Amino acid sequence: MMEKLKSEQFPLSPSAEGCASPPRGDGDARGKQEGTTAETGEHRLPEELNGVAKETAHHATELKKEVAVIELSRRGGSADIKGRELKAELSHKVQTTELCRPPIPLPLPPRDPLSDTRMVQLSPPAFPLPARAMLYSNMTTPLATINSGFAGDAEQYGMYPSNRVKRRPAPYEVEINDGSQPKIVRRIFTNSRERWRQQNVNGAFAELRKLIPTHPPDKKLSKNEILRLAMKYINFLAKLLNDQDDMVGGEAPARANRDSRDATLVRDDLLQEMLSPNSSCGSLLDGDASPESFTEDQDSSVESRPSARGLHHSSLPLDGNAQR
């Protein structure tokens, strides 16, 4: 009866043995120990088979769980989050690159028409011609009008000062063979002529300075002082020549008295001119020996000689008359 019950229990609960029947079957077989080894072998075979089946079933469920986890992770896990982040970054990058790109057709800034008006207008104007003339007529002048001979009239109405337009030309501008630039060539010729004239004037003053006697021979004199001293020196030489002619001709004593009076008047005039505050040579009196004092000494010495000689000559006829 027990064997039948056991044989009936095993086929009836093959799945139940996977949950809780194997420990109870093992307890019955170990407690009673009634049956042959074949029966025990038959009893253990289903357990082993069931054990293997249990293990395989356990592994299968684990595989199913792992596959399900992988599938979940692939479908809605971190991969989906990363994919969404990548899509968001890509969309963000596309937006930034589109924003960073310059606008394709934008109107030119207001400074470009200024440069267009300066250069020769090869492109059509953006505004109608009257409006463009009203906007930029008082600001700049085109290059054609500047290079033409009528540029002087256009400079009066420009916003820029005349010193920017009237620049000093470079030497290479003379080589430009253009009929619209006679003004530049004329300006260069005028500058060279003025420079040559100034050099000639300076050379003439240097030569005149060498002829004027001064106490320090290398004394520095201005152009005004050189001219004043040259005039005085010329007057002194002219008087000296006149006195020599009078001495050779033997004129009357009245002429000698007149010459002496003239000499004293000239000396007084020279002193007043030197002492006047407007004279540029008055500052030279502070020195030890000024050129004017030197020339005045010469004038006084030379003028005193003819006066003395005239007096001596005048005394001779008086003596002759007395003897007669």
UniProtKB/Swiss-Prot annotation:
GO terms for biological process: angiogenesis; artery morphogenesis; blood vessel development; definitive hemopoiesis; embryonic heart tube development; embryonic hemopoiesis; endocardium formation; endocardium morphogenesis. It is found in: Nucleus. InterPro entries: bHLH_dom, HLH_DNA-bd_sf, TAL-like. Expressed in hemopoietic and endothelial lineages. Isoform beta emerges first, expressing in the entire anterior and posterior lateral mesoderm (ALM and PLM respectively), and in the ventral wall of the dorsal aorta, where definitive hemopoiesis begins. Isoform alpha expresses later as two pairs of stripes in the PLM and ALM, and becomes restricted to the intermediate cell mass (ICM) by the 18-somite stage. The ICM is the key site of primitive hemopoiesis, giving rise to the erythroid lineage. Residues 1-49, 276-324 are annotated as: Disordered. PROSITE patterns: BHLH. Residues 185-237 form the bHLH domain. The keyword Transcription regulation applies. Keywords: Angiogenesis, Developmental protein, Differentiation, DNA-binding, Nucleus, Transcription, Transcription regulation. One of its GO terms (cellular component) is nucleus. GO terms for molecular function: DNA binding; DNA-binding transcription factor activity, RNA polymerase II-specific; protein dimerization activity; RNA polymerase II cis-regulatory region sequence-specific DNA binding; sequence-specific DNA binding. Transcription factor that plays a pivotal role in hemopoietic and endothelial development, acting synergistically with lmo2 and downstream of clo. Specifies mesodermal precursors to a hemangioblast cell fate. Hemangioblasts are bipotential precursors of blood and endothelium, and in the absence of hemopoietic induction cues such as gata1, tal1/scl-lmo2-induced hemangioblasts differentiate into endothelial cells. PANTHER family: T-CELL ACUTE LYMPHOCYTIC LEUKEMIA PROTEIN 1 HOMOLOG, T-CELL ACUTE LYMPHOCYTIC LEUKEMIA/STEM CELL LEUKEMIA-RELATED. This is T-cell acute lymphocytic leukemia protein 1 homolog. It comes from Danio rerio (Zebrafish).
